C-alpha cells in the first residue's frame, strides 16, 4: 500500500522591502497603547503594543510601556528601510506623547502629527460614571 506523499508547507521568509516613508498609528487607550506602522497604502510593516513588549495588568497603561512599544515597532520598521513617518494619534491614554517622543528618539523623521481621536456627535449613551 502506497502512502500519499504530502509536502510540508515551508515557512516563507518575509522579504525586506525598501519603504522610505510610512504612517505610524498610535492608539492610546486607558488600558493599553498600540503602535502600528504602515506604508502609505495602509499595509502593515510592523506593530507593537505594551502587552506584546512584556507588560501586563496596570503597567500596560503606563507612559513608559508606550515608549518601549514605540521603540520596538520603530526598530523593526527601520530594518525594512523606513526613514520618514507621519504620526496619527487616536485616543486619550497616557502613552500618546511618550510614544511620539520615542519615535523621534529612535531615529525616525516625523513630518506630520495628526490627532484623529474619535469624538461622538452625541451618539451612544456613555457608560456610568465611576464613583470612588
Swiss-Prot record:
SUPFAM superfamilies xrefs: Translational machinery components
GO function terms (MF aspect): rRNA binding; structural constituent of ribosome
Self-association and partners: Part of the 30S ribosomal subunit. Interacts with proteins S7 and S18. Binds to IF-3.
Source superkingdom: Bacteria
Protein name: Small ribosomal subunit protein uS11
GO biological processes: translation
Family designation: Belongs to the universal ribosomal protein uS11 family.
PANTHER family: 40S RIBOSOMAL PROTEIN S14/30S RIBOSOMAL PROTEIN S11
Keywords from the UniProt entry: Ribonucleoprotein, Ribosomal protein, RNA-binding, rRNA-binding
InterPro entries attached to this UniProt entry: Ribosomal_uS11, Ribosomal_uS11_bac-type, Ribosomal_uS11_CS, Ribosomal_uS11_sf
NCBIfam families (UniProt xref): PRK05309.1, uS11_bact
The keyword RNA-binding is annotated on this UniProt entry: yes
Disulfide links within the chain: none
Gene Ontology terms: cellular component: ribonucleoprotein complex; ribosome
Amino acid at each position: 500500500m502506497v502512502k500519499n506523499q504530502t509536502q510540508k508547507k515551508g515557512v516563507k521568509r518575509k522579504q525586506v522591502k525598501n519603504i522610505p516613508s510610512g504612517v505610524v498609528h498610535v492608539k492610546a487607550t486607558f488600558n493599553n497603547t498600540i503602535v502600528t506602522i504602515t506604508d502609505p497604502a495602509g499595509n502593515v510593516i510592523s506593530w507593537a503594543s505594551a502587552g506584546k513588549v512584556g507588560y501586563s495588568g496596570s503597567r500596560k497603561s503606563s507612559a513608559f510601556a508606550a515608549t518601549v512599544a514605540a521603540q520596538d515597532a520603530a526598530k523593526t520598521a527601520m530594518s525594512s528601510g523606513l526613514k520618514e513617518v507621519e504620526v496619527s494619534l487616536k485616543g486619550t491614554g497616557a502613552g500618546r506623547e511618550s510614544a511620539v517622543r520615542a519615535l523621534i528618539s529612535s531615529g525616525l523623521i516625523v513630518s506630520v502629527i495628526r490627532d484623529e481621536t474619535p469624538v461622538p456627535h452625541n451618539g451612544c449613551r456613555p457608560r456610568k460614571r465611576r464613583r470612588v
